[in-house]
Structures are given as structure tokens and as C-alpha cells.
């Protein structure tokens, strides 16, 4: 009954004989091995190297298959290079890295690289050149600017040249033309010397031009009960309504805009006087001219339709406005671009106010 349970398989010499199945927990003699194919030249090796473990085969395979990354042309020619980069030596990686670093340092040795405290490359200073491809007032060279003789008192930054000089230097984009500056109410305005030679009136006010416009309408319409004071009430009421409602910040009725309204009335009213028979129709027709004037000369993008509409006939209102724009678009644009044409229209309106 005193027999011991031992495994019939061979086990390690450290294993105690009294334990059960110690061979399952003791290190074995080695993993599965395989015998690689060998050439006739390698048959003389010792039998101890005939069997190698899988781990050893994998380690030796990784060392034997190291291939150099760079070609031999880029490496420096030396007699010990073949020995240093031997694939069977354990120091092949170290020697290969040294050779690559040596060749790289020889190629980029002439480049000067500066680092800051944080080991970052310092930025290359940019060239300090003040000239640009499209020269402006700040980047023109001194000698070129001196030759142009630019007038620094003008707003040259935004190219808002409003010089009264008739030379090309004063306004390089176009030849400036004389224009009259009209001020509101009883303020006098100065006309250019060319306009004075043509005996153009040198004074204009809003009240005078309103009276002249009313007299012209009274003389060229068939409405007997129309009075020039009606025109002043119609225009002032629309202007005041838009101001109170916040549609505009400044008043629209001024001498320059009255000249624009007179241009439409002078050219359109004689042809449509046979269509206007009552004071209400004349009122609607005048407000149509005023709406077109607001669209061309107003400071805002758009305006409401209600202050300009008399009654509910919107089709007639729009047809009248479109007809005015179609037939007199050229004259309306010419009034803003040509000071001569503006002076002519202004003179006609001024004569109407003085012909009473």
C-alpha cells in the first residue's frame, strides 16, 4: 500500500517523486522543432545545431533578412563597409545607422539651421518691400509719386477726387467738369466759371424751385382748379411721411432733386395732358413722377408704395412709372453725368419761377 504514483513519462530532475502529474506543470525539454533543409556545404556542422526551436528560428530569420535601405551608391566607399553591414552579425543595424547618418550629414552640412529655446526652427525674415503689384497712395515710390504731383489734400485713399482743377493731374480718371452745388432753402449756390459765362442764374432755393415747378404744371395742364400751392403740399407730405416712418434719415426735397422731378414733368406732361382732367388724376400723376425720382435719386434701397399711391389702381401706377423709365432713362442718367445738361434743366426751372 505504500506505492508512489509517478508519471511514466520522463520529467525534469527537480520534480519530486511524490507529486502527481508534475510533468504537466514543469518546463519541458523544448518546443516542437523542425529540421530545415541544408545544403551539402552545411553538412559538416555539429549535430547540436541540427535542431533549433521555433523562437530561435524566428529570431535568426529576422537578423538574416535585414536589407539595407539605401543603395550602395549613396554610402561612402570603404573597405570595412561590407563587414559593417554584414547581415549575419548582430551589430548590422547599428553600423548601418551610422553609415546613413554620416552620408546625410555630409549632404546637408553646408545648410545653416538655427533653433530657438524650444528647439524650433527660426523663421526666415521676410523681405521688407513696400511696393505692391497694384500701386496705391501708400506704396508708390517717392520718385514716381513726385512726378505725378498728387494733391494730398484730396481723398486719394478712396479715389474720391473732387478737385476743381481742370487739369488731368487733378483727376487722373476723367476730366472734371464744372458742377453747381445747390443748398437748401434760401442759401445761395455758386456755379462754375463756365456756367457764369453762359449767364446761368447763380442763386437757387427749394422754395423758389417749388414755385417754378408749380407754375410750369399750372401752365401745361387742363385742370383749372390746380394751384401751385397744391404741389408743395403733395411733395412735402410724402417727404414728411417717409421721415416720420423711418424710411429715410434726411429730407428728399432739395434743389437738386427738384431739378430731377422737373425733368420728368417737362418732358412727359405735354404728351399726357389730354389724359389728366381732374385734380385727383393730376395728384396721382405727380406722385408717380415723385416715386421714379425717389428710385433714382433717393439714399435708400427701396421705399414703400403706399405714400405714393392714390386710390387702389396699382396697375395704372406701375404702367405710368415703367413708361417714364423706358422713355427717359437716358436723360435721367445724363442729368447726373453731365453738368452741362444739368445746368440747362436748372436754368429752365429757374426761369419758370421768375416768369410769374
Swiss-Prot record:
Q: What happens when the gene is disrupted?
A: Accumulation of presynaptic components in the dendrite of DA motor neurons. RNAi-mediated knockdown results in an abnormal distribution of GABAergic synaptic vesicles at synaptic termini of the ventral nerve cord. RNAi-mediated knockdown in combination with exposure to pentylenetetrazole, a GABA antagonist that induces seizures, results in an increased convulsion incidence as compared to wild-type animals.
Cytoplasm is among the record's keywords: yes
InterPro entries (alphabetical):
CDK5_activator (IPR004944), Cyclin-like_sf (IPR036915)
In which tissues has expression of this protein been reported? Expressed in all classes of neurons in the ventral cord.
Q: Region (Disordered) spans which residues?
A: 1-53, 66-99
Compartments where found = Cytoplasm; Cell projection, Dendrite; Cell projection, Axon
Sorted alphabetically, the Gene Ontology BP terms of this entry are: anterograde neuronal dense core vesicle transport; axon guidance; regulation of dense core granule transport; regulation of protein localization; regulation of synaptic vesicle transport; retrograde synaptic vesicle transport; synaptic transmission, GABAergic; synaptic vesicle transport
Compositional bias (Low complexity)? 40-49, 71-92
Q: Identify the keywords attached in UniProt to this record, alphabetized.
A: Cell projection, Cytoplasm
Q: What name appears for this protein in its UniProt entry?
A: Cyclin-dependent kinase 5 activator 1
What phylogenetic lineage does the species belong to? Eukaryota, Metazoa, Ecdysozoa, Nematoda, Chromadorea
Amino acid at each position: 500500500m505504500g506505492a508512489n504514483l509517478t508519471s511514466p513519462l520522463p520529467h525534469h530532475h527537480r520534480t519530486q517523486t511524490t507529486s502527481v502529474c508534475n510533468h504537466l506543470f514543469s518546463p519541458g525539454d523544448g518546443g516542437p522543432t523542425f529540421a530545415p533543409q541544408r545544403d551539402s556545404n552545411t553538412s559538416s556542422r555539429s549535430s547540436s545545431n541540427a535542431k533549433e526551436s521555433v523562437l530561435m528560428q524566428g529570431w535568426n530569420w529576422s537578423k538574416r533578412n535585414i536589407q539595407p535601405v539605401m543603395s550602395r551608391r549613396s554610402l561612402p566607399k570603404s573597405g570595412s563597409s561590407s563587414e559593417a553591414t554584414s547581415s549575419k552579425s548582430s551589430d548590422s543595424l547599428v553600423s548601418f545607422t551610422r553609415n546613413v547618418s554620416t552620408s546625410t550629414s555630409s549632404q546637408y552640412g553646408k545648410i545653416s539651421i538655427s533653433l530657438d529655446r524650444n528647439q524650433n526652427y527660426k523663421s526666415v525674415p521676410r523681405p521688407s518691400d513696400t511696393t505692391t503689384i497694384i500701386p496705391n497712395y501708400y506704396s508708390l515710390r517717392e520718385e514716381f509719386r513726385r512726378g505725378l504731383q498728387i494733391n494730398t489734400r484730396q481723398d486719394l485713399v478712396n479715389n474720391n477726387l473732387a478737385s476743381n482743377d481742370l487739369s488731368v493731374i487733378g483727376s487722373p480718371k476723367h476730366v472734371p467738369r464744372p458742377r453747381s452745388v445747390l443748398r437748401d432753402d434760401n442759401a445761395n449756390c455758386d456755379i462754375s466759371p463756365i456756367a457764369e459765362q453762359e449767364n446761368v442764374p447763380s442763386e437757387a432755393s427749394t422754395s423758389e424751385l417749388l414755385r417754378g415747378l408749380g407754375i410750369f404744371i399750372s401752365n401745361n395742364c387742363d385742370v383749372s382748379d390746380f394751384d401751385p400751392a397744391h404741389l408743395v403740399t403733395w411733395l412735402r407730405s410724402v417727404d414728411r411721411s417717409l421721415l416720420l416712418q423711418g424710411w429715410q434719415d434726411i429730407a428728399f426735397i432739395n434743389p437738386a432733386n427738384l431739378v430731377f422731378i422737373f425733368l420728368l414733368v417737362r418732358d412727359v406732361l405735354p404728351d399726357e395732358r389730354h389724359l389728366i382732367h381732374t385734380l385727383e388724376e393730376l395728384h396721382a400723376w405727380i406722385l408717380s413722377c415723385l416715386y421714379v425720382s425717389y428710385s433714382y435719386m433717393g439714399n435708400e434701397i427701396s421705399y414703400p408704395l403706399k405714400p405714393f399711391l392714390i386710390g387702389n389702381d396699382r396697375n395704372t401706377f406701375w404702367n405710368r412709372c415703367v413708361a417714364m423709365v423706358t422713355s427717359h432713362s437716358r436723360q435721367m442718367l445724363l442729368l447726373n453725368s453731365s453738368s452741362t445738361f444739368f445746368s440747362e434743366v436748372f436754368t429752365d426751372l429757374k426761369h419758370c419761377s421768375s416768369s410769374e
